[in-house]
């Protein structure tokens, strides 16, 4: 599968996750914030909390849950990228409520698992 195909599939499932989270009451801010450090798929606001979302898709869960694809190295990149986003938008990371969620999608989008606070800063 080529890069274009992976990107198109990624966009499709990120769009599905975006719609799902909006139906849950989160307010969409931005998609695909990219830096040299990494990328954040989706950014939302829930009440006063900035929510950074990693979207993962697996066609078949027999090889494990899509959420398991977020390893410690990926989590560290997400956190560093989130701090860059906060800085760019004038937020102070020490005084800003934030969390890191994962949306795991399986079965061609028929199974969506939203894991709030899936990644902790430490």
UniProtKB/Swiss-Prot annotation:
Coiled coil: none annotated. NCBIfam families: PRK12497.1-3, YraN family protein. Belongs to the UPF0102 family. CDD domains: PoNe_Nuclease. It comes from the Bacteria. InterPro entries: Restrct_endonuc-II-like (IPR011335), tRNA_endonuc-like_dom_sf (IPR011856), UPF0102_YraN-like (IPR003509). GO terms for molecular function: nucleic acid binding. It comes from Vibrio vulnificus (strain YJ016). This is UPF0102 protein VV0603.
């Amino acid at each position: 599968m080529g890069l274009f195909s992976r990107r198109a599939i990624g966009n499709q499932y990120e769009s599905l996750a975006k719609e799902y989270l909006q139906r849950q009451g989160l307010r969409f801010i931005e998609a695909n914030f990219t830096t040299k450090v990494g990328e954040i798929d989706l950014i939302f606001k829930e009440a006063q909390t900035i929510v950074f979302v990693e979207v993962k898709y697996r066609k078949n869960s027999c090889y494990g849950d899509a959420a398991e694809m977020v390893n410690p190295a990926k989590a560290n990149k997400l956190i560093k990228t989130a701090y860059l986003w906060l800085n760019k938008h004038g937020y102070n990371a020490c005084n800003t409520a934030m969390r890191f969620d994962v949306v795991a999608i399986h079965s061609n989008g028929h199974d969506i698992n939203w894991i709030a606070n899936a990644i902790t800063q430490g």
